[in-house]
Swiss-Prot record:
One Gene Ontology molecular-function label: DNA-directed RNA polymerase activity
One Pfam family it belongs to: RNA_pol_Rpb6
UniProt keyword annotations, A-Z: DNA-directed RNA polymerase, Nucleotidyltransferase, Transcription, Transferase
Entry-linked InterPro entries: DNA-dir_RNA_pol_omega, Pol_omega/Rpo6/RPB6, RPB6/omega-like_sf
Enzyme Commission number(s) from the entry: 2.7.7.6
Source taxon at top rank: Bacteria
Broad class of enzyme this protein falls into: transferase
Catalysis performed (reactions): RNA(n) + a ribonucleoside 5'-triphosphate = RNA(n+1) + diphosphate
Lineage, uppermost ranks: Bacteria, Thermotogati, Deinococcota, Deinococci, Deinococcales
Protein name: DNA-directed RNA polymerase subunit omega
GO biological process, one term: DNA-templated transcription initiation
Function (record text): Promotes RNA polymerase assembly. Latches the N- and C-terminal regions of the beta' subunit thereby facilitating its interaction with the beta and alpha subunits.
GO cellular component, one term: cytosolic DNA-directed RNA polymerase complex
Length: 99
């Protein structure tokens, strides 16, 4: 991202630390399947979720501390999703063993 974009992002938070935490949390949400607020043409340019999270914040469509997904709900959803993935892998392994 350009330096002017970083400066804009820093103005949204009270510290560089908070900006990095918010960006990391949003990148994790995106990784776990949370929908992006960016138009499709902007999402296609990068597969880097940290950059995508920073772009989302820079557009103003996400506001720090207000409309990011609730952290507890996000964690519960992530755990359920991961458990389902592991169960599917286990079932596939059991199926292969039967063959």
């Amino acid at each position: 991202m350009a330096e002017k974009d970083i400066d804009k992002l820093l103005s949204l938070t009270d510290s560089k630390y908070r900006l990095s935490v918010v960006t990391a949390k949003r990148a994790l949400q995106l990784r776990s399947g949370a929908p992006s607020v960016l138009p499709v043409e902007q999402r296609v340019r990068t597969h880097n979720l940290v950059t995508q999270a920073m772009r989302e914040l820079a557009t103003g469509q996400l506001t720090v501390g207000t409309n990011l997904i609730d952290e507890q709900r996000f964690h519960q959803d992530y755990v359920r999703q991961r458990q389902a993935q592991l169960q599917a892998q286990l079932n596939a392994e059991r199926e292969r063993e039967r063959d």
